[in-house]
From Swiss-Prot:
It is found in: Cytoplasm. It holds the Pfam family MurB_C. GO terms for molecular function: FAD binding; flavin adenine dinucleotide binding; UDP-N-acetylmuramate dehydrogenase activity. Disulfide bonds: none annotated. Keywords: Cell cycle, Cell division, Cell shape, Cell wall biogenesis/degradation, Cytoplasm, FAD, Flavoprotein, NADP, Oxidoreductase, Peptidoglycan synthesis. Gene3D superfamilies: 3.30.465.10, UDP-N-acetylenolpyruvoylglucosamine reductase, C-terminal domain, Uridine Diphospho-n-acetylenolpyruvylglucosamine Reductase, domain 2. Residues 29-202 form the FAD-binding PCMH-type domain. This is UDP-N-acetylenolpyruvoylglucosamine reductase. Pathway: Cell wall biogenesis; peptidoglycan biosynthesis. Its EC number is 1.3.1.98. The lineage of its organism: Bacteria, Bacillati, Actinomycetota, Actinomycetes, Mycobacteriales. One of its GO terms (biological process) is cell division.
Length: 369
């Protein structure tokens, strides 16, 4: 990192030049950015983006906006990049309403809610990244999604510069998606400034729905448990799968699950189930979905020949986690191209075997599958 200082154009936000982005992402890949503007308040975020977006209309490059860097793959050749980093991290609680600024560490939000006796977020414990990223792709795990509890989101409209609250109903949440999700990470039309959650003040968790978690708690489906006990069970399950970031463990340097679980028609599921029975491959893990049948992407990946730790060559800079076949991990020296190359191989291999195309979950900046 070279020069740093405070930017008067950006309401006092901190500006640093020549900043390596790899340490700011959970995958630990990325270029050296031309400058990073770190905003510790919503006012700084709005001021910075209004100025930079106005400049972009006259030919300047649009900035990349992120906070925790947990869902990004950024190409190393983007050396002229300007980054607006969200570090506005306030968390406020009013009764059963929890409001988290975009840069708040999401797991800190979960902890604060549980400490206040509020249920609803405990199944999402240990998910890396910021609160502001959660509504964008409707983050979920262990039978829960943030759409279960989000009431509204405060947004900056980058086209008009307007700041407004938008109700959950208008966010059109779906499986790992919302109206906020955009394929081009450099052309995102809105930026989340704050998220509001309405939680259960009863002191009990949301109803348990996920079989593995239910078994770990020795509970029954639909039971409401102690939120802290649920959190501890979830963290233990995530740790066993390498899904809790550990800076000393390359097996956790990832974006989490790289591919979403595909939703297929009933006919496609029945074909796969029949083929699996013929091969004596065991039952096909599946779950009901509003528009079909949701399959377990990890099962497809492993049955297509990509086992945990693939490729086995110890020198491979990017490999599947040894604990979870959906996590593509940086073994210490991987580039974005290494990650994308492995992702392509896995995606194409699954398609060749099953005729199903897996879709990536992270945002790809300057690279594509």
């Amino acid at each position: 990192m070279k020069r740093s200082g405070v930017g008067s154009l950006f309401a006092g936000a901190h500006i640093a030049e020549a900043v390596p982005l790899a340490p700011l992402t959970t995958l630990r890949v990325g270029p050296i950015a031309r400058r990073v503007i770190t905003c510790t308040s919503a006012e700084q975020v709005v001021a910075a983006l209004r100025h930079l977006d106005s400049a972009a209309k006259t030919g300047a490059d649009r900035p990349l906006v992120f906070a925790g860097g947990s869902n990004l793959v950024i190409a190393e050749n983007l050396t002229d990049l300007t980054v607006v980093r969200l570090a506005n991290s306030g968390i406020t609680i009013d009764g059963n309403l929890v409001r988290a600024e975009a840069g708040a560490v999401f797991d800190d939000v979960v902890v604060r809610a549980i400490e206040q006796g509020l249920g609803g977020l405990e199944c999402l414990s240990g998910i890396p990244g910021s609160a502001g990223a959660t509504p964008v792709q409707n983050v979920g795990a262990y039978g829960a999604e943030v759409s279960d509890t989000i009431t509204r989101v405060r947004l900056l409209d980058r086209c008009t510069g307007e700041v407004r609250w938008v109700s959950a109903r208008d966010l059109r949440f779906g499986y790992r998606t919302s109206v906020l999700k955009h394929a081009d990470g450099l052309a995102v039309p809105t930026v989340v400034l704050e998220v509001e959650f309405a939680l259960d003040p009863s002191g009990r968790s949301a109803p348990l729905r996920y079989g593995e978690l239910i078994a770990a708690l020795n509970a029954t489906s639909g039971e409401r448990a102690d939120p802290q006990a649920v959190r501890e069970a979830v963290l233990a399950l995530r740790a066993r799968k390498g899904m809790v970031l550990d800076p000393t463990d390359h097996d956790t340097w990832s974006v989490g699950s790289f591919f979403t679980n595909p939703v297929v028609t009933q006919d496609v599921y029945e074909r796969l189930a029949g083929d699996a029975a013929t091969r004596k491959d065991g039952p096909v893990p599946h779950y009901p979905a509003p528009d079909g049948v949701k399959l377990a992407a990890g099962w497809l990946v492993e049955r297509a020949g990509f086992g945990k730790g693939y490729p086995d060559a110890g020198a491979a800079p990017c490999r599947l986690s040894t604990k979870h076949a959906l996590a593509l991990t940086n073994r210490g020296g991987a580039t974005a191209e290494d990650v994308v190359t492995l992702a392509r191989a896995v995606r194409d291999g699954v398609h060749d075997v099953f005729g199903i195309t897996l879709k990536p979950e992270p945002v790809l900046i300057g690279c594509m599958l």
